Amino acid sequence: MSHIRAGKTKPEEIVAKYLFSAGFRYRRNVKNLPGTPDIVLKKYKTVIFVNGCFWHMHEGCKYFVWPQDNAEFWRKKLFANKERDEREQIELTRLGWNVIVVWECELKKDKREATLQNLVATLRENRNESNKL
């Protein structure tokens, strides 16, 4: 498990490339923010986490299935991941960041375009809201 490295997963690359092609500029895996967000759009005061459905317990998702082997280990591990995610999102919100979570299953071919279009619309809406302040 210690050899599993974060960053530059295929789902993250899909989101990053789409955002770049839509004119957004960002930083990847910013370590000085809680949770080391996958994508940080400072101009929009927004962070994006691209979460794997298994590792982050996407409830109700067909891609999240409890492992049968070593069940107690996985239960503890995955619940700890979920609790950590919640703590980090609360802290980021407290610091004034907008937090967006994109799930791996939302980037499957049948949902990808709609998900990415909604993401861009949300970012532009957030930007417009922050300009009103």
Question: How would you describe each model-predicted region?
Answer:
Residues 1-101, 105-133:
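Nucleic-acid endo/exonuclease domains
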